[in-house]
Amino acid sequence: MPNRRARKKRRTEDFSSSSASENDSDSESVTSVQEEQPDAPETYTIDGLDTQEVSDSTQVRLQQLNADRLASIEQSLSGNLKLDINAVRQIDDVREQLQNEYLKKLLVTYSEDLDALRQKTDFKENSLKTLARLLKESGNIFDDGTLKSLVE
């Protein structure tokens, strides 16, 4: 494959041709452009690189710095994890309060129906607990914003 200088020279010669043979030079320049394919990228290996030997004291110092850096990263991550856990607990507590208020609102709204159920002969104490849990959990169909607006 011709080197770059030869290709460039050929291209320059193609463009500097006379106007009488303009059509011929156009077809030649198209051909020369098509011949111009990028060279395959050179591959490098690390075997051929000159590397400097690092002294033992430098390696020990680098390991110590890496260990210190790793320890500081671990501390910040554990601090962030504690913050996340606390935030999740706070969100869960607020959600629990909203569900309790939702249950109270439902109990007030359906108090007559609940009294009618309690007077039935097949109604038991566990039935009341199950019904209360069911009503409370029905608040899970709403997101926090909707549940808050229902309670207020």
Curated annotation (Swiss-Prot):
Any one cellular-component term (Gene Ontology): preribosome, large subunit precursor
Stretches for region Disordered: 1-51
Entry's Gene Ontology BP terms: ribosomal large subunit assembly
Family membership noted in the UniProt record: Belongs to the RSA3 family.
Bias-annotated ranges (Basic residues): 1-10
Keyword line: Nucleus, Ribonucleoprotein, Ribosome biogenesis
Protein source organism: Ogataea parapolymorpha (strain ATCC 26012 / BCRC 20466 / JCM 22074 / NRRL Y-7560 / DL-1)
Signal sequence coordinates: none
Subunit structure: Associates with nucleolar pre-ribosomal particles.
Locations listed in the record: Nucleus, Nucleolus
Function: Required for efficient biogenesis of the 60S ribosomal subunit.
A Pfam cross-reference name: Rsa3
Protein name from the UniProt record: Ribosome assembly protein 3
